[in-house]
Amino acid sequence: MNRRQLLLSLSVVPATVALYVASPAAIALDLGGMLGAAAGDIVKAASLTDQDVRAYASQMAGYMDRKASVAPAGSGYAKRLSVLTSGLSEDQGLRLNYKVYVTKEINAFAMADGTIRLYSGLMDIMTDDEIRYVIGHEMGHVKNGHTKQRMQTALAASATQKAVASSGAKHANLADSVLGDMMVKVVRAQHSQGNEREADDYALQFMGRRRYDRKAAVSALEKLAKLSGGGGSNWLSTHPSPTERAARLKTQIV
């Protein structure tokens, strides 16, 4: 798979564990190179530990940060995020770190090492508690092991198709072409209704623990529904529409 094929494949799905569908512009951050740098030596899927996942996630997050336009510490976006995440460097044993990518795209993603990245386009349209819902949702993806599951699935498929790992070796050097194929599998594997619901449920519980306005979870999804044409019917069939998710969360708020 060449670079053009990879970007075309990714143009219909979000990068990493994104909460919303990203456009090609948001994804075209040299993903092939990112994975090549981050995962030169990847353990077999069967032996992938939590420590392995966190290590690779950290490298990949670092690459993304270098390639993206990160809001500087003194900027309005960074200051707002600092206020919003005050006291949120850790949640239920999960150590977290935050940054804002300056882009018009409406998106957010999390990685297994506790990396959470918000896009400035998302912050522009959401209230403080709506952003906290997004943060809680991304925490949910990490806490529920969705990121680890995606990587294991992708590694298993790549190892099978490309024979990247021998039976006697723990690590295998993966070519960028294999990594590109693996990245497509990673982002496609994440879009299960079960995963999204678990992340939404975690977000609601997180907001309750922190005494944030839980109704903001519903209003955030309703905003996204309007942006996607009233239900996101063009999303992948395995990705619940924001309208459906908002309606489901309403039933849980008393």
Protein language model regions, located:
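A Zn2+-metalloprotease active-site environment signal
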Residues: N2-V254
